[in-house]
């Protein structure tokens, strides 16, 4: 089979840096899917992305589509011809659809009869005739939230397109994509290398672009260069670079030929909380901060330039000049804010709405204060500290620093509280109330902080559900999904004995008559249990395990987690499959019983040896496991229940449950009811697949 490497590049104006990697990988995935759909063989699709280009390279792409045989079955011969042997309308219509006449059709004989059939071979097209359409479709299906038009063209794309290059080996695939005719012209770096040059063969990409155009098209290569050089620069300064993946990807998306440099700022700025300085460096300037070995911020930072002059000092000084006013602003805000105590800002919260129907931030603060104290009492935290932290929880939103640098909310509250002489646990809780901020983030360290974090999240969940504004589709303006999952993580991972329904009831009571949804408790609990499902599925827990536990609707998250772990373990036992099937059988039998089913077994009505054996074990386990269930030791309980497999199997093999004698029948049903209820104290095992 003849193969060639294929290459396609779309040259654009500067693409959105936060979206570049996603666009490039989606482009490659789309191309791969289109190639497979077209039946074209290939080894691999590589993707490339730089600020002004998206590109793919298909390795060892087949030069032709394979030919394929088709078989279209028509009507049965008995229905294809009338009594005189002439084709019926059904046969003629089918033949027309196949592009043949009825007499050209073949016959297919099966054990069910004889049929008309059309067989043909469709010759595969040359790959070069297909690639223009494949690339166009792949670009059209990119995840672009907002497109733009340019010039006098009617086409739309994420940014204006200037060049399109499609090469199959050395052959140019001619045509037009996004209003631009395909050609061999590749654009280089804006300031380095050749501005434009010609590419003659797909194999020359991306090396020719780097050699002539001073552009490293390989996103991952640029990323690794920036990461390695940044770490080296930080080490040379006796520190460690703070390089987050998202910021590294964004910086990689901003440069075509990275030049990693270091700069400094005045040490006096280190008197400002490091978080505010880092927010400016990372968020505004896209710099990498440097910390010493003890985690203290150093007066240096790393930045990445897109040019590589002989003398880098003008660039370094320029970046130092740019960041200085931002750090000065942070210093000014910090010093100004310290002139007022956090508590003095409480009245200003009355001027800011949390939500029109739910009141102001001051209203929310008072609810958090009350609920945090309630939660603290339940989990053994200091109630007074939790209430104090709840009272101060939103005060930093009124400071100059947080108004200017919004991502510093919480952390600045902590620093200002320390300055005010607040208890350290209270101060730290002001920062940790927002934890976890994202998937995988740290949880609050102390129980005081956990109390405030939970109070804040439950207040938001209860309030928004209470006015009927639950998330719909992907829209979640109050981040309720994140709040729910964060609350669940805190309760489960810290093993807190808290009940969701109880917390929502207490939270709802604090809203007075503001809530209009009478079902708010059930709605919030169901929503949070739904988040549990997603969380466990992401963690690799089988869906049927989650459904088995959900069927019992346990509303204590720590208890829910213990059940899931126990059922996951039970599922691995040799007896699990048979007991799940037996539970399903028991469930079906009991579902057909009219009226109430007894839950006491009458030993005098036990006749068969197999039912006596089952009753003996079931009653023994009922007594033995009562304290085990009370402790929530569900794994031990299921391990013990697993020993019932043999006696349950023997019972169903030898005993007729629905006996004609009513007393016998009801007693056997009662025994199955006791058996099933033992399992139901953990989960509905009958739902296991």
UniProtKB/Swiss-Prot annotation:
Pfam families according to UniProt: DALR_1, tRNA_synt_2f
Classification via NCBIfam families: glyS
Oligomeric form and interacting partners: Tetramer of two alpha and two beta subunits.
Organism field: Actinobacillus succinogenes (strain ATCC 55618 / DSM 22257 / CCUG 43843 / 130Z)
Record key words, sorted: Aminoacyl-tRNA synthetase, ATP-binding, Cytoplasm, Ligase, Nucleotide-binding, Protein biosynthesis
Major localisation: cytoplasm
GO CC aspect terms: cytosol
Gene Ontology BP annotations: arginyl-tRNA aminoacylation; glycyl-tRNA aminoacylation
Enzyme class: ligase
InterPro entries: DALR_anticod-bd, Gly-tRNA-synth_bsu, Gly-tRNA-synth_heterodimer
Compartment(s) of residence: Cytoplasm
Family of the protein in this entry: Belongs to the class-II aminoacyl-tRNA synthetase family.
EC number: 6.1.1.14
Highest taxon, organism lineage: Bacteria
GO MF annotation terms: arginine-tRNA ligase activity; ATP binding; glycine-tRNA ligase activity
Catalyzed reactions per annotation: tRNA(Gly) + glycine + ATP = glycyl-tRNA(Gly) + AMP + diphosphate
UniProt-recorded name of the protein: Glycine--tRNA ligase beta subunit
């Amino acid at each position: 089979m003849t193969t060639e490497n294929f290459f396609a590049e779309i040259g654009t104006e500067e693409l959105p840096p936060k979206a570049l990697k996603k666009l490039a990988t989606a482009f490659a995935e789309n191309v791969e899917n289109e190639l497979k759909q077209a039946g074209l063989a290939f080894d691999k699709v590589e993707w490339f992305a730089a600020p002004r280009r998206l590109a793919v390279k298909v390795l060892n792409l087949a030069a032709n589509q394979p030919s394929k045989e088709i078989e279209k079955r028509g009507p049965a011969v008995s229905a294809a011809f009338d009594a005189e042997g002439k084709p019926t309308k059904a046969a003629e219509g089918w033949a027309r659809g196949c592009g043949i006449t009825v007499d050209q059709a073949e016959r297919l004989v099966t054990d069910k009869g004889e049929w008309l059939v059309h067989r043909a071979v469709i010759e595969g097209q040359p790959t070069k005739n297909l690639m223009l359409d494949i690339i166009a479709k792949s670009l059209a299906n990119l995840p672009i939230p907002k497109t733009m038009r340019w010039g006098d063209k009617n086409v739309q794309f994420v940014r204006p397109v200037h060049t399109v290059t499609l090469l199959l080996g050395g052959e140019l695939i001619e045509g037009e994509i996004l209003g631009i005719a395909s050609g061999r012209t590749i654009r280089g770096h804006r300031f380095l290398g050749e501005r434009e040059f010609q590419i003659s063969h797909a194999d020359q990409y991306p090396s020719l672009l780097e050699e002539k155009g001073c552009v490293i098209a390989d996103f991952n290569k640029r990323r690794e260069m920036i990461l390695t050089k940044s770490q080296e620069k930080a080490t040379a300064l006796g520190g460690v670079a703070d390089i987050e993946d998202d910021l590294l990807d964004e910086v990689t998306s901003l440069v075509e030929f990275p030049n990693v440099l270091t700069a400094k700022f005045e040490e006096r700025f280190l008197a400002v909380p490091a978080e505010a300085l880092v927010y400016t460096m990372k968020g505004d300037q896209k710099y990498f901060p440097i910390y010493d070995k003890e985690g203290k911020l150093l007066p240096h930072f790393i930045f990445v330039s897109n040019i590589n002059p002989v003398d880098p000092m003008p660039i370094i000084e320029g970046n130092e000049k740019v960041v200085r006013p931002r750090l000065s602003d942070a210093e000014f805000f910090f010093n100004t804010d310290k002139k007022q105590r956090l508590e003095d800002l409480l009245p200003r919260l009355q001027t800011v709405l949390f939500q029109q129907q739910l009141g102001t931030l001051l209203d929310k603060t008072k609810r958090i204060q009350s609920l945090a104290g309630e939660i603290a009492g339940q989990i053994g935290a200091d109630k007074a500290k939790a209430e104090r932290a709840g009272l101060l929880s939103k005060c930093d939103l009124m400071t100059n620093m947080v108004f200017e640098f919004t991502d510093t909310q919480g952390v600045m509250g902590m620093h200002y509280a320390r300055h005010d002489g607040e208890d350290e646990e209270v101060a730290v809780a002001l920062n940790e109330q927002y934890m976890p901020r994202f998937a995988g983030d740290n949880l609050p360290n102390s129980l005081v902080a956990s109390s405030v974090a939970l109070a804040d999240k439950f207040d938001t969940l209860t309030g928004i559900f209470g006015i009927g504004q639950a998330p719909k589709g992907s829209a979640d303006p109050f981040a309720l999904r994140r709040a729910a999952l964060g609350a669940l993580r805190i309760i489960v991972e810290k093993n807190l004995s808290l009940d969701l329904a109880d917390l929502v009831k207490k939270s709802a009571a604090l809203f007075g008559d503001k809530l209009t949804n009478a079902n708010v408790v059930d709605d919030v609990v169901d929503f949070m249990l739904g988040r549990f499902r997603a969380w466990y599925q992401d963690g690799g827990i089988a869906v049927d395990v989650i459904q088995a536990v959900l069927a019992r609707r346990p509303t204590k998250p720590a208890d829910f987690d213990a059940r899931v772990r126990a059922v996951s373990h039970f599922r691995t036992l040799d007896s699990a499959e048979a007991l799940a099937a037996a539970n399903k059988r028991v469930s079906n039998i009991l579902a057909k019983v009219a009226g109430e089913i007894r839950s006491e077994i009458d030993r005098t009505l036990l006749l068969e040896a197999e039912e006596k054996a089952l009753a003996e074990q079931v009653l023994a386990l009922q007594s033995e496991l009562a304290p085990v269930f009370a402790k929530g030791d569900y794994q031990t309980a299921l391990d013990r229940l697993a020993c019932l497999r043999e006696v349950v199997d023997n019972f169903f093999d030898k005993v007729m449950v629905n006996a004609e004698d009513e007393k016998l029948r009801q007693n056997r049903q009662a025994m199955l009811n006791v058996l099933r209820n033992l399992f139901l104290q953990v989960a509905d095992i009958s739902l296991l697949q």
